[in-house]
């Protein structure tokens, strides 16, 4: 079992470059304190076009706690928040129950997020869908319920 954390940030246009620099430094802090991987990007579609996002991956909840304890000690996060031009809009924690592909970060250019609801995880259906994705160029994927955050209702999957 592993976990993924998805965080969305709002930044003022004139602060975007500074925010990206700070987020990259925060990424290194999480990697040094328990994260097994991290990706930074910008949403290109949907209701939040232009928002910065970070995906972090962890082996267990204890590693999430260690990474976030280290982030709270960093003056970088405080600096960004005190600027008034940077804020965290949204954070969800996903329990990964199905993981597929190679996760080769150098090859990935895009990430596709799909959020859906179901009464059960439907792992057989997801497994078949993962085969379709990888046979058509997908490098990797993770699937599971959102366990912490606004959509943690036991029926919402990412």
Kindly label every feature range from the protein language model:
Residues 1-158:
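Short S/T/G/P-rich N-terminal loop/turn motif that feeds into the first structured element of a domain
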